[in-house]
Amino acid sequence: MTQPLALADPARVITIARAWLGTPYHDQASLRGVGCDCLGLARGIWRDVVGPEPFPIPPYSRDWGETGSREVLAEGARAMMIEVEPAAAGPGALVLFRMRPRAIAKHVGILIGRESFLHAYERLGVIEEPLTPSWRRRIAFAFLFPQR
């Protein structure tokens, strides 16, 4: 977006994100309490924080990020959100993780505090867990939600 955006209230983002806790994992879904994957979680939070999704997400395979070098998630987030340096990201920020060095960022989470984050994880569903050094060093991009 070309115009400056006002930021959504981080406390509101966190409250909305926590409402998704316990949602089962379901590939490509985005329905609180029913099922979601990590991208579906971010999409659902977007709808509650900002409003309707600005564009449809095409179907994707589980291994979509295993080949290629395009940072598809970062490009999409950059078009609608406010990018910040990962080290400066605080509670309520959407973060993108590289699951392997030099791989594209393909996992999404929401920072809950400086020491925890929320994400949808296969077999576990939506959980909140500590932002351990292992998770922290995987953060490749961070974005803030705009205000509705």
Question: Model segments located where?
Answer:
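Short glycine- and Lys/Arg-enriched binding-loop motifs that mark or flank ligand-binding interfaces
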Residues: 18, 25, 31, 36, ...
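A broad structural signal for alpha-helix termini and local helix breaks/kinks
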Residues: 21, 49-50
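Short secondary-structure junctions
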Residues: 25, 79-85, 138-141
